[in-house]
């Protein structure tokens, strides 16, 4: 399984850091301090201007994940959510020439986007259930907007359907090439794969169930300040998928947590303050949780340069097998 370019090792992050410095200069910030704060599907930097004290966030895109038109489409949805749905999202800071997506020259060139710095912190871990109720409510507002929004001409984002996640496209690599994939693991996860494919096909892609989603709407991508409305960040994975996938993504890496049933109930409670969720869809929640879990087995194998992937490693595959056995035998996995 081939790692994506930001996990390829060598001096790639040194070169990406230089790209970030160049992007800051092109934004009129020649003396800015540029600090790497996260690497995943892109590299995220904090940009501090020592002259004014202003702070912003710069995203340097990985290669081959999004064409420039898809990045522009993401930014269009952020703006629409903020202006039409009342969802707090970061504003884009255009370059002096008006460009919202800045292609920085280099070998190879990379697309970059500068965002305003939003105040707030991730909801505290000791109040996970409370955080999930807020998350459910803001997710519902985003889904309600997505169902009626008229996408602008040229709008393009990828899909998170079965083929894109686990099938012929396998955007993050194939789970069969994941870490710790012993014969026993292959056997149980292959059974899981087949069950997921069949159930998702039966669930269908009707307009009420499938549309534009954030696709990584974890608590880590919420910023809260006191009891006010949260801000939603990191839309880089947004695309077309099942709305319930946003709940599954919220449970990423913690699917085994003993409070997961309470987290799900809290998310549903928050969601239903905004819009309905039919019982027949609620019945498939664990199908989507396991769909996301199997996708993350593949993700860990291709993102070895990301801290959480290195930390979880083959143990995540083993835990996935345990959850899969419970799911396949009709027992709630948590």
Residue ranges and their predicted role:
Residues 1-97, 226, 333-334:
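Conserved NTP-binding catalytic cores of kinases and kinase-like/nucleotidyltransferase enzymes
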Residues 2-7, 174-175, 295-334:
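ATP/Mg2+ or Mg2+-diphosphate-binding catalytic cores
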Residues 40-58, 92, 194-244:
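Active-site acidic catalytic loop and adjacent metal/ATP-binding pocket
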Residues 49-151:
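ATP-binding pocket architecture of kinase catalytic cores
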Residues 63, 98, 110-125, 170-180, ...:
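A glycine-centered beta->alpha junction motif in the catalytic cores
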Residues 123-187, 208-210:
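A cross-family kinase active-site recognition segment
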Residues 130, 277-289:
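All-alpha amphipathic helical-bundle segments outside canonical DNA-binding/catalytic cores
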